[in-house]
Amino acid sequence: MDSSVKLPYYATDVPLPLPTEAEIENALNISPEYEGKGVNLVEEENMLFVQEMTKVPVPRVYALYSNPQIGKNYIVMEHIARETLAKLWASLTGAEKESIVAKLHSYNTTRSYTSCHHQVTMSIDKQTLLDEIFWTQHTEAMINSSFITEAALNKAMVWKYTHDSRPHYKADFYCQCLPHIFCGHKLMFTHGDCQHKNIMIQSDPQWMTANNRTLEIVILDWEKSGWYSSYWEYCLAVCALCWDDDWGLWIEKMLDLFISEVSWLQILRLELWS
């Protein structure tokens, strides 16, 4: 499957007739983040790619299309009626946490297969990188486009630093240091926001015993996903930690560690997105 999705997209396995635009507009239970003219189809394009190319569980996407006359995008997808892992985490047993983390680790390994021949850091639609660190008010090719090499990605972060009118001497310092830290990494299709609030959990009643239960997971929030250097997933997962529970202590069991890289990327993120 090509990484880009041809739009409009309509799935062939829709369980019920698709709602009309009028029904969507009048629906009462649509999440605020999926309302209005700001709806971005790239998150669902990412999910379609993951659904097709990996074993990572994501909500089923049934339709992606636009109405240019009113300037709106429409997404029809599976509703996941489950609790977030963040809400349930404190109540889980050690064995249940181990089971969930083992599944997440296996999904991380699966994602690496999708990138073995991929050579460009980019978003799924080959357009602007959507991680906040690359945000600019208007598209800037030097900062948030696709990048052929890891060195070019490093330069993009330095360009973002100077773009925001920060001291050029420190930008020069980053130019000296980053090539020694962010180098030699392979590319991997990256979720980009690996937090337990973005993982939905449901117990499977068919596999429950007196002392154990099987927990099925579905991963949400693929908006910022794309092909990034292999350190990106771990570093962003650590950067997002609030340390209000022990979730951060389990990350090393699900993602490859990049200890040196996370220290530098956290500094950059604080400066470039604050």
Region roles according to the model:
Residues 2-141:
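ATP-binding pocket architecture of kinase catalytic cores
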Residues 55, 73, 186-188, 216:
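The start of beta-strands in P-loop NTPase/AAA+ ATPase cores
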Residues 66, 81, 196, 224-225:
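Short, glycine/acidic-enriched loop or turn micro-motifs at the edges of active sites
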Residues 271-274:
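A positional/structural detector of protein chain ends, strongest at the extreme C-terminus
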